[in-house]
Amino acid sequence: MTDSRFRRLPVGIQSFKVIREENYLYVDKSDIVWNMVNLGDKYNYLSRPRRFGKSVLVDTLESYLEGRKDLFEGLKIMQLEKDWKQYPVIRLDMSRGGANEDTLRSYLNLRFKDYEEKYNITPDPTAMLADRFHAIIATAYKQTGLRVAVLIDEYDSPLQHSWRTPEHEKCTGVYREVFAILKADDEYEHFIFITGITKFTQISLFSVLNNLSNISFMPEYATICGITEEEIKENFMPELKQMSEANNWSVQETHDRLKAYYDGYHFSRRNMVDVYNPYSLVNALKSKEIINFWASSGATSLLPKFIDNAELRLSKFENCSVMRNTLELSDVSGGGAELFLYQSGYLTIKDSDEFGYILGFPNEEVKQALYETVLPALAMRSESEILSLQACLYRYLGTGQIDEAMNSLKALIADVPYSNKKLASMDMEERYRLIISTILNAIGLNVEVEKMISTGRIDMTVKTSRYIYVIELKLRNNGGKVAATEQILNRQYMEPFKADKRKVIGLGIELDENGKGLLDWKRAE
């Protein structure tokens, strides 16, 4: 038996062959793969967020369709598959297609050349890409006697990266030209599988392949990517225990922290099983640390392209309503901010009814990453200017150093409510509330804005591992810090938190009515 200390976690590995041959841990999805190929539809599209295991899934499909029985020994599929046919497979990884027409054509040209060499095809020098694609599919079928499987990974990558540039329409034209052949060559094809993040319906994959099944919301595929609670218990208990020991936490506490930070995705209204982000979970178990892996994965880079003024709209994204057709059928370019945020993994399904879906943040990691991304635009400062002040604020709030924390916050918000013209439609106190809550969310604290209790509405509660801050904001011309602390005490805002083991601190903050920033503060005691 392998010593649990030396079990190999597949951090960053996307090759199913490498995972199996080099003895990395593998969460067995092979039964779902078999069901999809043998019992599902012929043409399939699956949308999942970035870093959610789509490429490993495509690689698993390729190995299965090529009949690599040796790689599946001991997995669930061995009880299902009897024939192990070796289908010809054509695989395209569109994440290598760049962000302009020339790079896209160059990638397809090189990939088609590989398959032309494999099947001894000599293309006409003047042949269009679509003609070459057809020749590859038809020849592969004729030479092997088996219909062809076509796997297209990250189909939307060139379209995402060219969005809102002159190259986007050119890239769309390439897609229409090349991939329309998939419908025309139906007689030669066994199985088509396409993955992506965002859905552009106006290209040939969706407008021409009108028989393409969007399996993204189907209950039987809700867990085809990602890791479930049950799969953690089956596969990762030794790593969970090691992480507990390394941090002096109980196993239950470690589990609860991982769940709060990386779990919470739901992909089907008819199968609301919780799904962890596999990239973040495996990285956390490997490093034995709970940190934000999402932000470093490149998942936030496209946000400004698809959402205008996101920094002003964050509070509206929690528990937002979306019509079912919008979420399941609409084009990302016209479906609104909520659609992009769902497809890219910032939001997930929280509930559904006959009126549509309720969306919200899946977990703390994603919520923090989103707030971090928009903070520079809101604070009108560069990321480098903000980082050191954020680090100080996080440390001081975590250790109960009130004066030092308030001075860091003061430096972060100086002049912002006055200078940021995007805030002009808000009243001044609302501007401060937005800015301060965004800053606190961006450093990963648990923040509730305008929390209702029996005696009133608290402006803000902020929770760290050792402290709970009950905060009231007041403009100077509305009584300032004195009125704020009196309100905390008179309305007993701290009482609901007294049973918590953490120390409760009431804090009145005085703000300049002209938007020049934080003036003073006072503890409520």
Residue ranges and their predicted role:
Residues 140-144, 439-465:
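Active-site metal-binding core of divalent-cation-utilizing nuclease and nuclease-like domains
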Residues 496, 502-525:
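Domain-level recognition of nuclease-like catalytic cores that cleave nucleotide substrates
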Residues 149, 467-471, 505:
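Structural motif
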Residues 169-175, 475-494:
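Mg2+/Mn2+-dependent nuclease catalytic core
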Residues 178-185, 339-347, 437-442, 487-507:
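Metal-dependent nuclease catalytic cores in nucleic-acid-processing enzymes
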Residues 430, 434-438, 468, 486:
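Feature representing long, continuous alpha-helical segments
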Residues 436, 460-462, 466-477, 491:
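Conserved catalytic cores of phosphodiester-cleaving nucleases, focusing on short active-site segments
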Residues 1-428, 443:
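Phosphate-binding site recognition
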